[in-house]
Amino acid sequence: MVEIQSQNEHHKFWANHLLPQFRRYIAEIGAYTSKQQDEHVKFFDSLLPHLGPRLPHPHTKAVLTVANMPLGFSVNLSDARKPIARMEIEPLDDTSGSAEDLFAANCIPACFTTLVKGMTTRVDTRWAHQLRQAFTPTSEESAIAKPRLRPGIERVSLAYFGITFDGDNRAMKYCTSHWPKFLGTATAESNDATSADAFLFSAIRRLKPGGEALAPSLDAIQHYFQNERHAKLPSPILFVGLDCIDPSRARIKMYGRTHSTAFSNVRNIMTLGGRALTAETTEFLARLRSIWHLLLNDPKAKDDEDYDRPPLDPNSLRTGLLVSFEVSALVSTPDIKVYVPFWQYHETDVQAINNLEQIFSLLGWDWGSGKYGDLLRKTFVGTDLAATQNHDYVSFNYSKRQGSYMTMYHVPPRPESTTA
C-alpha cells in the first residue's frame, strides 16, 4: 500500500476524507490488481489540491453534485467487459466564486495540466481548449451573466472532468458550459433557449479539425428541437462534454433536462420524435422499458407509459431526467442516453440498492446477489445506508457491441467536520 504525503491543511482535509473511500471503492469493484490500485490512488491524490479549500468554501459551493461535493465516484457495468471505475471532479480554488472569479475559471488551467500529466493513454486537448476559449467569459461578461442566471442558480461551472480507470489505463473527459459566455454576450432580444442552443451548436461545428464531420448528427438534433415544441423537450442544452482523444474518434455529449419521467416521453426523445427508430433503438427501449419502474422506484410506471413520477424534491432544479445527445465523426445519427436522478425517486441508499440489485439480476449480472450493496457498505464505512442517499444519477444503455451497460454515480458523504 502506498503512503500519501499531504502537502497542506486543505490537501490533508480532502485526503483524510476521500483517499480511504476511493481506495476501498476500486478494491471492491474487483477489476484492478494491487499495483493498479496503488497507481490510481497516487493519481487520485494528485488531484486533491484542485478540490479547493477545506469546507466550507469561503465563496461558493460545488455544483457538480446535488450534495455540493466537488467530486464523485461511478462504476460502469456491462455485458461485454469487466467493471470500470470512474470519477468526476469540479476544480475550485480559494477565489472561486468571489468577485474576482465569479465562474471559477482561474483554477481550470492548473487542473488541466495535472490531469494530462496523469493520463496513461494518449491525450488530445485541441477540441477541449477550443471550447474552453470559446466559452470562458471575460470579467466584464461574467458581471453581466451573473444576474441573468436562472433564479436559484448561484453559479454555472465552466469545467468538470471525468476520468476512466480501465485496468492500467486512465483516460479523461472535459465538460464545460456555454451559458456564462452566452449570457454575458447575448442581447435582451436573443437571451432565450433557442438562441443559447444555436450558440452552442455553432461553436461545435467550428471545431478544428473535423467539426464539419459532426454535421449530420447535429442537424438531426437541431431538427428535432425545432419540430418538437413542447414543455417536455430536453432543451436548452445545459452543458457539453467531450473525450480528450483524437478528434476523429472523440465523442461530444450535449446534456439537457426533461422534466417528465413518462416512458412515452423517453421514447420520443430516444427516437428524436420517431425519426431515428432503428432495430438497435427498439431493442434498447424494450430493455429499458422492462426496468423503468425499478429505476423510478414506482410500480405505477410498469404498466402506464404516460405515468410521470413526481420527484421527492419538486423545488430542486434537478427534476425529471438528464438527457445526453452524443455525436461523433464515426456515426451519422446521435446516440441518446437518459440519466435518472436516483435521489429524487429513492429516499435512501437501501431503496436504491434493492432496486438496482433486482435490475442486475434481470440482466444476468452477479452484482445482483449482494455485491453492489457491499460496494457501498465497504466504501462508505460508518454510513447508515438506511438513512442516507449517496446515489446521484443512474444511466442505462444498450448497443449491439456492448449489450446492456449501466453507470451508477455516487457522491461521497460530506465531511461532518471542517477540521483536518
UniProtKB/Swiss-Prot annotation:
Keyword tags: Transferase
UniProt EC number: 2.5.1.-
One of the GO biological process terms: alkaloid metabolic process
Family matches, as Pfam families: Trp_DMAT (PF11991)
Protein's pathway: Secondary metabolite biosynthesis
Annotated GO MF terms: transferase activity, transferring alkyl or aryl (other than methyl) groups
InterPro entries named in the record: Aro_prenylTrfase_DMATS
Residues given in the record as substrate binding sites: 86, 251, 253, 255, 339
Induction (free text): Barely expressed under any of the conditions tested.
Binding site for L-tryptophan: 65-66
Enzyme superclass (EC): transferase
Family to which the UniProt record says this protein belongs: Belongs to the tryptophan dimethylallyltransferase family.
Described purpose of this protein according to its UniProt entry: Tryptophan dimethylallyltransferase; part of the hps1-dma1 gene cluster that probably mediates the biosynthesis a derivative of cyclopiazonic acid (CPA). The hybrid polyketide synthase-nonribosomal peptide synthetase (PKS-NRPS) nps1 might incorporates acetyl-CoA, malonyl-CoA, and tryptophan (Trp) and utilizes a C-terminal redox-incompetent reductase domain to make and release the tryptophan tetramic acid, cyclo-acetoacetyl-L-tryptophan (c-AATrp), as the first intermediate in the pathway.
Protein name: Tryptophan dimethylallyltransferase dma1
Organism lineage string: Eukaryota, Fungi, Dikarya, Ascomycota, Pezizomycotina
